Amino acid sequence: MKNQKIRIRLKAFDYKLIDQSAAEIVDTAKRTGAVVRGPVPLPTRIRRYDVLRSPHVNKTSRDQFEIRTHQRLMDIVDPTDKTVDALMRLDLPAGVDVEIALQ
């Protein structure tokens, strides 16, 4: 797998979970002899929602909610077969979305 790169993108609502998962991936890749670039924190996406408190009147009274989506980006340069196998066997928490692209 020479001259290839694995790009890993992590998404989660909890920044502690995403940092823990990124550390596990970096540890696993370094143990198998691969070079890791990152994790690079990408901008946090904040989605805000305004909801009326009252079902009838008082339109000026509203509740505000938000969902923050944290993202991290990592590149594994020149991965070995051991690296790919170790990453496939890695068990990450349920709240973390992982996207893997081979370039």
From Swiss-Prot:
Annotated SMART domains: Ribosomal_S10 (SM01403)
Entry keywords, A to Z: Ribonucleoprotein, Ribosomal protein
Pfam families linked: Ribosomal_S10
Keyword DNA-binding: no
Keyword Ribosomal protein: yes
GO function terms (MF aspect): structural constituent of ribosome; tRNA binding
GO cellular component, one term: ribosome
Disulphide bridges: none
Any one of the GO BP annotations: translation
Domain of life from the UniProt record: Bacteria
Protein family per UniProt: Belongs to the universal ribosomal protein uS10 family.
Biological role stated in the UniProt entry: Involved in the binding of tRNA to the ribosomes.
Oligomer status and interactors: Part of the 30S ribosomal subunit.
Protein name: Small ribosomal subunit protein uS10
